[in-house]
Amino acid sequence: MRRSLLICVLMMTLSLSAGGGGGGGREAEELALTIRGEYLAMMSCAAQAVVTADYGQRVYRYELSAAVNGEEALLTLTAPETVAGLTARIEEDEGWLEYDGAILETGELAPGGLTPMGAIPALLETARSGYLDTCVLEELGEVQALRVVSRDPEEKQGSGTETTLWFDAATHALVRGEISQDGVCVLQCEFSQFTKE
């Protein structure tokens, strides 16, 4: 067990070295590794977020609350009013929307099945295991934030799927996340509240 943890930490360090860390400096890289370790150890989290999904010809904006416990995520839409109360339950690779017994399906935003209801689980998975391409400390509104860009190291920058996460540098809470496909932002999450255990 100890040997696998050591190998995992070494691989993350090599990933940052190979990716250059994006000019964020050693402090940003070390903070990114610390935050990754915390998210790997996290048992559960709760969040309030605004999710914007861009399908190209139409854009949808949802407000939701999320409770993630292990491999299960329970998401409840709180706005717009027409869908408030709609619940999404995601367990491992399966997900469905339900409301008073009715099940609703949403369309994919990107190859691989990314949908608005899978946004928060996808962002959390990236926080835990995404390839760290760029790590930069910057101001995000009034918050000192760590911006981490994750992408497939085999793809050119701006092609394929790229995920950008912003963490509060002091609390390590996730404050924002974006998923882009071939250089176009298809999904954005703004967190007004995020707690983890």
Predicted regions and their residues:
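N-terminal leader/targeting segments and the immediate start of mature chains
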Residues: 12-67, 195-197
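Flexible, processing/modification-adjacent segments and terminal tails
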Residues: 49-51, 97-156
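Positively charged n-region of N-terminal signal peptides that target proteins for export
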Residues: 1-5
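Short, exposed beta-strand/loop patches in secreted or surface proteins that constitute
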Residues: 38, 64-68, 88-89, 133-141, ...
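Hydrophobic lipid-interacting interfaces of membrane-associated proteins
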Residues: 52-54, 80-82, 102, 182-184
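One face of beta-strands
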Residues: 45-51, 58-77, 86, 95, ...
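An acidic-aromatic
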Residues: 65-119
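Gly/Pro-enriched, hydrophobic low-complexity segments
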Residues: 133-197
